[in-house]
A protein has these predicted regions:
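Bilobed periplasmic-binding protein-like "clamshell/Venus-flytrap" ligand-binding domains
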Residues: 457-475
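A glycine-rich phosphate-binding loop feature that marks nucleotide/adenosyl-phosphate handling sites
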Residues: 476-481
Length: 517
């Protein structure tokens, strides 16, 4: 067995020392473990989700209680993660289903060029198209390892045996190069096998709290528990991968990063910019590199901070790797326990996600979080935030919960639930997260918050201008002009023309004649 490669905490203290270490054999391994649409883990006190592997990593490393993605859809969130840049800085990659810009590099590509053995299983970056100049597929997260399969426990769980594929990756390792592996589960992305949670001993009464923007009934609770089953599938493979890494003597010097691309795939969560949309679980473990492990931090951190953290750990810079300058910040002050936080604010935003509006229009939002306040600016409030009703609210994945909310519109007593998830929104929103984590009470028109509203609006726009956001320069329409690579592109226009284009992620019952009572 090869001797373990160590990088001491003293080396991590300075960029010069790190660069020196990176030229030798002491660079840390990197293990990224990303769930698909997971907003919950047991370590955060969720009694109906059991994640012993995640919880163990958090207890042996750092649990981040205020980690966020800036853009809560798979492709743009993952683009931010692998580049260290906010989505409005990524041109086409700000959108869902884009063509990834050929001149924007990912950190796994940079690590591969510097001698790392890279690979991934499951879902890397996507959905979208990423190609080299010759038309071949780019390995944005490494070489694909998806050949090993399993018999899924439910019809909603993917057949890829993630842990076994990590084993296949290790078989090709030369035992000299440092490792960089991406475990990208496709769970808990929809669809689910409705009611499968009962086979795993789960009961609707297990749910301690249903968000205030959904009906609290057995159907919704069952949907939540089916989602929990898939998170637990992710966690089981996480545990197996950690055991395998330990068995080859490499866990001690591996930076293990466990997170999700965004929040849960339910109405008013995934695809929006509320707390449940953008807040993500995050635990980082590095046995020989984190000072005072077992900590919990409330520092505001972004998924854009992961790439600069990794680059600092391995001793590389953007300039020498050809990566674009990163807007994210290294987490080393937190890992070293030398600072309580790295920033007092976070920026959020989205552009075009799934189709379903005329001409494939997006729903542009920008936002900022500071001092437990969330400010959002909706730049096209006349557009439907969840997608047009008559084309199935395509920006919300089909589900039993979504069906319940569409039904709620027809009942005067529950119509407000439909308004919260599907209805039109004002130009500005402001929420006090310390008292209203569900983001129900919009304070934008409250005189008591007028000064906060003005200050947050000004700070957000100033910081976005500094980052070169086209929307701050009057060029925001460029995001709608970028090609849409989804097979359901121009869905609204095609439906209106009498076609029946594919709509895999929504149900036929989602199509809603808004005038119907």
């Amino acid at each position: 067995m090869q001797a373990r490669r160590y990088i001491s905490l003293s080396l991590a203290a300075g960029a010069g020392a790190l660069a020196a270490a990176a030229t030798g054999t002491h660079r840390p391994n990197i293990l990224v473990c990303m769930a698909d649409d997971a907003g919950h883990m047991g370590a955060y006190g969720t009694p109906w989700v059991h994640t012993p592997a995640f919880d163990s990593i958090a207890s042996r490393g750092i649990l981040f209680r205020n980690a966020f993605t800036c853009n809560s859809k798979s492709a743009p969130s993952r683009a931010c993660f692998i580049t260290g840049r906010n989505s409005w800085q990524l041109r086409e990659a700000a959108n869902h289903w884009p063509a990834f810009p050929a001149d924007i590099r990912s950190f796994p590509e940079a690590l591969k060029d510097s001698g790392y053995y890279t690979g991934y299983t499951g879902k890397g970056w996507g959905p979208g198209i990423a190609q080299n100049a010759d038309g071949s597929e780019r390995e944005l997260t490494g070489k694909k390892f998806n050949s090993r399969k399993l018999k899924p426990a439910t019809t909603g769980i993917n057949k890829i045996d993630y842990a076994a594929n990590f084993g296949e990756y290790l078989k090709g390792w030369d035992h000299k190069s440092p490792l960089c592996f991406w475990y990208g589960a496709r769970e808990p992305h929809r669809g689910y096998e409705y009611g499968s949670s009962a086979r795993f001993g789960k009961h609707p009464a297990d749910i301690d709290s249903v968000p205030a923007y959904w009906p609290d009934n057995e159907t919704v609770r069952t949907d939540m528990l089916d989602y929990a089953v898939e998170i637990e599938h992710f966690d089981r493979h996480l545990g197996r991968i950690i055991e395998m890494l330990d068995s080859v003597g490499e866990l001690e010097n591996t930076i293990v990063i466990v997170t999700s691309d965004h929040g849960m795939p339910f109405p008013r969560c995934k695809g929006q910019e509320y707390l449940a949309s953008c807040h993500v679980p995050l635990a980082i473990m590095w046995p020989c590199g984190i000072k005072n492990p077992g900590r919990v931090t409330d520092s505001l951190v972004s998924l854009t901070d992961i790439a600069p953290t990794i680059m600092e750990a391995v001793g590389l810079t953007e300039a020498e790797t050809g990566m674009e300058p990163m807007s994210g910040r290294s987490l080393f002050p937190i890992l070293n326990d030398t600072a309580a936080g790295i920033r007092p604010y976070l920026l959020l935003g989205r552009e075009r996600h799934d189709p379903g509006r005329p001409d494939d229009q997006g729903y542009p939002i920008r936002g900022i979080i500071r001092d437990n306040l969330l400010y959002l600016r909706n730049y096209e409030p006349s557009r439907w935030p969840a997608g047009n009703p008559e084309t199935g609210y395509m920006d919300v994945d089909g589900s039993h919960t979504k069906t319940e909310i569409i039904r709620a519109r027809r009942n005067p007593a529950t119509h407000y639930l439909w308004e919260l998830s599907m209805g039109l929104r004002p130009e500005e929103e402001l929420y006090d997260l310390s008292r209203d984590a569900d983001c129900i009470t919009n304070l934008a028109a409250d005189p008591a918050y007028a000064a906060h509203l003005k200050a947050l609006r000004a700070e957000m726009e100033t910081r976005l201008r500094a980052e070169g956001d086209p929307r701050m320069e009057g060029r925001g329409d460029i995001f709608d002009r970028y090609p849409n690579k989804c097979e359901s592109h121009q869905f609204y226009n095609r439906v209106k023309a009498g076609e029946k284009p594919p709509h895999k992620w929504i149900n036929d019952s989602d199509f809603d004649n808004y005038g119907q009572k």
